[in-house]
Amino acid sequence: MADRQRWVIKIGSALLTNDGKGLDCALMQTWVDRMVALRERGIEVVIVSSGAVAEGMTRLGWSARPDSVHELQAAAAVGQMGLVQAWETRFQQHQLHTAQVLLTHDDLSDRKRYLNARSTLLTLLGFGVVPVVNENDTVVTDEIRFGDNDTLAALVANLVEADRLLILTDQEGLFDADPRSNADANLIREARASDPAIVRVAGGGGLLGRGGMATKVRAGKLAARSGAITTIASGRSPEVLIELADGQGPGTTLLPDTTPMNARKQWLAGHLQMRGRLVLDAGAVVRLREGGSSLLPVGVVDVFGQFSRGEMVACEDERGERVGCGLVNYDAADARRICRKKSAEIAGVLGFMNEEELIHRDNLVLMEAGSRVSGA
């Protein structure tokens, strides 16, 4: 193991609460003890912690989870106090401090705020503080929601350039079939995060997909973009942390590709909300994938959605498969007017020309083939 590593550890509500009814402080103490042991081995730790809503419900005396978004946000606000206090109290027993970091997708979609969040987290780690990260449920809306803490943890792993993302769950890892209905199901010990077959296994219907394994595999793909190894493992015992540090292999390990994206493209790839879609002809797809070119308007056959200059759009081929995503140089109305046109014709059509490309290659991230694009 390298002299110093950095791990992002995502712990779900089921591993921190008493059946969803408030925090299990004794169990949290065990988690903290094991994370302190990791630090003593030279492993920096960032925690992505669930449990705020469950703790808030207990403090408010609610026996049933509310349906109202505002009530859930209120519970999260109340519970976040208890969650942070619980982590801080237990780390202080080891003379360590924690820091609360609440994020929304907007924080990571804006380049300046992204860099500020990164600088803050790295500064905290430099001071020996343990960051405790969660989504800012009190103010978040559907438009800026990460959707789940697995995705948030992956983006944090990219943000701090973690060596490992550890997603702890109530399952042993990813199986090649549903182990609850198939006694012959085998645990997948290791795979490439970019392997499309892994996504199909995790989300190809049945209980595995509904149980959230698909989101964990997608998080592994996202974390792999910065070179992080992802391990999906059972968190029923906090000893899993020590086992992994000892080089043992519980769970499923998703390996990154050999060349991680540079910092800017990591940020671009972290945009989960696309403001629109550009449909590319076959020639444009080949030029992007094989030649590393910018996207010119002549290669765009259709434009969907409403977006402004500088916003993130998805690029897809004519079969609807993801090619990439990037920051567009023209708004939706202008993009529709210049699609299928040569760059030399832009000024004549619009009366001006911002750039000769619809998306410059420096602002474009290519995706592996076989990924469907959701409608914009």
Swiss-Prot record:
The keyword Cytoplasm applies. Signal peptide: none annotated. Pathway: Amino-acid biosynthesis; L-proline biosynthesis; L-glutamate 5-semialdehyde from L-glutamate: step 1/2. One of its GO terms (molecular function) is RNA binding. Keywords: Amino-acid biosynthesis, ATP-binding, Cytoplasm, Kinase, Nucleotide-binding, Proline biosynthesis, Transferase. Substrate binds at S50, D137, N149. Residues 275-353 form the PUA domain. Pfam families: AA_kinase (PF00696), PUA (PF01472). It catalyses: L-glutamate + ATP = L-glutamyl 5-phosphate + ADP. Its EC number is 2.7.2.11. ATP binds at K10, T169, D170. It is found in: Cytoplasm. It comes from the Bacteria. InterPro entries: AceGlu_kinase-like_sf (IPR036393), Asp/Glu/Uridylate_kinase (IPR001048), G5K_ProB (IPR041739), Glu/AcGlu_kinase (IPR001057), Glu_5kinase (IPR011529), Glu_5kinase/COase_Synthase (IPR005715), Glutamate_5-kinase_CS (IPR019797), PUA (IPR002478). Belongs to the glutamate 5-kinase family. HAMAP family: ProB. PANTHER family: GLUTAMATE 5-KINASE (PTHR43654), ISOPENTENYL PHOSPHATE KINASE (PTHR43654:SF1). Catalyzes the transfer of a phosphate group to glutamate to form L-glutamate 5-phosphate. This is Glutamate 5-kinase. It comes from Alcanivorax borkumensis (strain ATCC 700651 / DSM 11573 / NCIMB 13689 / SK2).
